[in-house]
């Protein structure tokens, strides 16, 4: 009998072991769909991005008009741009839900998989930031100025670091050119990191909602979970196409329809919605260096998740107190996102400060305490 190429061919064998014959826990829920959705998001963003890059000019005098030209004169250029811009929002929705799932079900105990995932998040944030600068509208320019300026908070090397990032003494043509180069390069780095992420995941196998070892009871990924993933793709593309076709500018900033002008500062500089929670934490601290450190800590704190796990149970499925705390954390993040979009005035300042404090207290202090308390309750 001839060997099946799916199982013997060096490349097809890898695909087979990752997507077809992959042993999968039988009880994983829809929360396990987001990994594959993120993969589809990445492919979509790279394809639409490549098409946009063929019509884009990375020059301060031409960038804004080249984007307008793409939307007006290129066949379906408006659609490609709308899919790319709104695809980024969907990418972040999926990654935040994916991280939330990881925190809820204790997936962070697979340390290598979790750490590569956090590095992926940081790479995605960097890619989205440099990408937002490319249309060279008002918010692009001032967003780049404000965020890159944060590096100047570092003692001694700060100012040198900023000028090195800018390629001059302000955000100008060299900045735009290097940001375009980075925005083109980083998605391929993300694709490589994704393979590392998957390699580490397939070393241990997937976690499941009960947090139990399911090696004795696994089923092949295809045909049991492939249709489930397909349904996920359809349910993701529906809102994306609806957004791109009916309300493409809903999540954008009207300021970005004005070409960048270094002489006019917008009344309220703010990043895209998916960075608002971190921006609110940054703004909550009156000291510049303190704000930058809090901003970095708000994301880097995820690296500590495996060390803050004190419970004897892996998931929160049977831990009502931890569940309550988890949903308080989610609500807190939504409050931070809302505060980040508001002007810097009372009562938003104090709400932001309290929510920022609550964010770190919940993750660093309350989760370990509640975990230890639930261990005690198991003895009764």
From Swiss-Prot:
Cofactor(s) the protein requires to work: heme b
Bilayer-crossing regions: 34-54, 78-99, 114-134, 179-199, 227-247, 289-309, 321-341, 348-368
Chain sites annotated for binding heme b b566: 98, 197
An annotated Gene Ontology molecular function: ubiquinol-cytochrome-c reductase activity
Residues that hold a ubiquinone according to the record: 202
Cellular localization per UniProt: Mitochondrion inner membrane
Membrane topology reported for the UniProt record: Multi-pass membrane protein
Cofactor binding note from Swiss-Prot or TrEMBL: Binds 2 heme b groups non-covalently.
Keyword terms: Electron transport, Heme, Iron, Membrane, Metal-binding, Mitochondrion, Mitochondrion inner membrane, Respiratory chain, Transmembrane, Transmembrane helix, Transport, Ubiquinone
Residue sites binding heme b b562 per the record: 84, 183
Alphabetized Pfam families for the sequence: Cytochrom_B_C, Cytochrome_B
Location (main, coarse): mitochondrion
A biological process from GO: mitochondrial electron transport, ubiquinol to cytochrome c
Further remarks about this protein from its record: Heme 1 (or BL or b562) is low-potential and absorbs at about 562 nm, and heme 2 (or BH or b566) is high-potential and absorbs at about 566 nm.
Protein purpose: Component of the ubiquinol-cytochrome c reductase complex (complex III or cytochrome b-c1 complex) that is part of the mitochondrial respiratory chain. The b-c1 complex mediates electron transfer from ubiquinol to cytochrome c. Contributes to the generation of a proton gradient across the mitochondrial membrane that is then used for ATP synthesis.
Subunit structure: The cytochrome bc1 complex contains 11 subunits: 3 respiratory subunits (MT-CYB, CYC1 and UQCRFS1), 2 core proteins (UQCRC1 and UQCRC2) and 6 low-molecular weight proteins (UQCRH/QCR6, UQCRB/QCR7, UQCRQ/QCR8, UQCR10/QCR9, UQCR11/QCR10 and a cleavage product of UQCRFS1). This cytochrome bc1 complex then forms a dimer.
This protein's name: Cytochrome b
Organism: Todus todus
Gene that this polypeptide is encoded by: MT-CYB
């Amino acid at each position: 009998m001839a060997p099946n190429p799916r199982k013997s061919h060096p490349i097809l064998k890898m695909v087979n072991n990752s997507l077809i014959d992959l042993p999968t826990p039988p009880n994983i829920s829809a929360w396990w769909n987001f990994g594959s959705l993120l993969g589809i998001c990445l492919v979509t963003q790279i394809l639409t991005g490549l098409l946009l890059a063929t019509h884009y000019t990375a020059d301060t005098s031409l960038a804004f008009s080249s984007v307008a030209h793409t939307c007006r004169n290129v066949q379906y250029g408006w659609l490609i741009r709308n899919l790319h811009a709104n695809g980024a929002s969907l990418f972040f929705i999926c990654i935040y839900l994916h991280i939330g799932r990881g925190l809820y079900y204790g997936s962070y105990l697979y340390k290598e998989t979790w750490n590569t995932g956090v590095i992926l998040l940081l790479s995605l944030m960097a890619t989205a930031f440099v990408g937002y600068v490319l249309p060279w509208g008002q918010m692009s320019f001032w967003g780049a100025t404000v965020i890159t300026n944060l590096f100047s908070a570092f003692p001694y090397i700060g100012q040198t670091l900023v000028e090195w990032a800018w390629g001059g003494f302000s955000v100008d043509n060299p900045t735009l050119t290097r940001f375009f180069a980075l925005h083109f390069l980083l998605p391929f780095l993300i694709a490589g990191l994704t393979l590392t992420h998957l390699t580490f995941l397939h070393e241990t196998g997937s976690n499941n909602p009960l947090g139990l070892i399911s090696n004795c009871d696994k089923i092949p990924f295809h045909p049991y979970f492939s249709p489930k993933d397909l349904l996920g793709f359809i349910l993701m593309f529906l809102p994306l196409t609806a957004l791109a076709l009916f309300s493409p500018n809903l999540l954008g900033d009207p300021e970005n329809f004005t070409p960048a002008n270094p002489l006019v500062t917008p009344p309220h500089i703010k990043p895209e919605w998916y960075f608002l929670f971190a921006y609110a934490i940054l703004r909550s601290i009156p000291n510049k260096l303190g704000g930058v450190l809090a901003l970095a800590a708000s994301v880097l704190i995820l690296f500590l998740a495996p060390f803050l796990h004190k419970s004897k149970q892996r998931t929160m499925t049977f831990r009502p107190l931890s569940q309550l705390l988890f949903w308080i954390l989610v609500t807190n993040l939504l409050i931070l996102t809302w505060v980040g979009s508001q002007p810097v005035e009372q009562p938003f300042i104090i709400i932001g400060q309290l929510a920022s404090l609550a964010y770190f207290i919940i993750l660093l202090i309350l989760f370990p305490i509640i975990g230890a308390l639930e261990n005690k309750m198991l003895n009764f």
